[in-house]
Amino acid sequence: MIIYLHGFDSNSPGNHEKVLQLQFIDPDVRLVSYSTRHPKHDMQHLLKEVDKMLQLNVDERPLICGVGLGGYWAERIGFLCDIRQVVFNPNLFPYENMEGKIDRPEEYADIDTKCVTNFREKNRDRCLVILSRHDEALDSQRSAQALHPYYEIVWDEEQTHKFKNISPHLQRIKAFKTLG
């Protein structure tokens, strides 16, 4: 089972395309939708939904995957639910760059302070990070600096922020999922 979390643009047709691409790894891909506008509510909702899926799950090696803001959530929810994560161009600093787009961007900073101390250290090697060198929305070098001490970084030379085509990375993701 692969759980897919969309980014800020929840209505993008690219979400469906990514789900179809992920089905080459596992036919059981589940899209979990969330508001993107209310961080504390989103965290509660995502934890509840992912936990429910895991309770009914028969896959011994489930995976959670997210793009952009979905990557922010996939890393945290995956850690809290003890499943491996794959994140594409994760938005690591939404409290800085979501101003004017959501109601309370400061809630992300609050979530960061309330999350498990040094959670990335405790999550070491359980998240695969795929970053685009051509991310027009986020500073991928800053993301790499924050995540490299804990996770493997894979660089993509073609894609932009929304990562329309993940197929060149499917074999790597499949191998990572198999490690479970």
Swiss-Prot record:
<dbReference type="InterPro" id="IPR029058">
    <property type="entry name" value="AB_hydrolase_fold"/>
</dbReference>
<comment type="similarity">
    <text>Belongs to the UPF0227 family.</text>
</comment>
<dbReference type="Pfam" id="PF05728">
    <property type="entry name" value="UPF0227"/>
</dbReference>
<dbReference type="InterPro" id="IPR022987">
    <property type="entry name" value="UPF0227"/>
</dbReference>
<protein>
    <recommendedName>
        <fullName>UPF0227 protein YcfP</fullName>
    </recommendedName>
</protein>
<dbReference type="InterPro" id="IPR008886">
    <property type="entry name" value="UPF0227/Esterase_YqiA"/>
</dbReference>
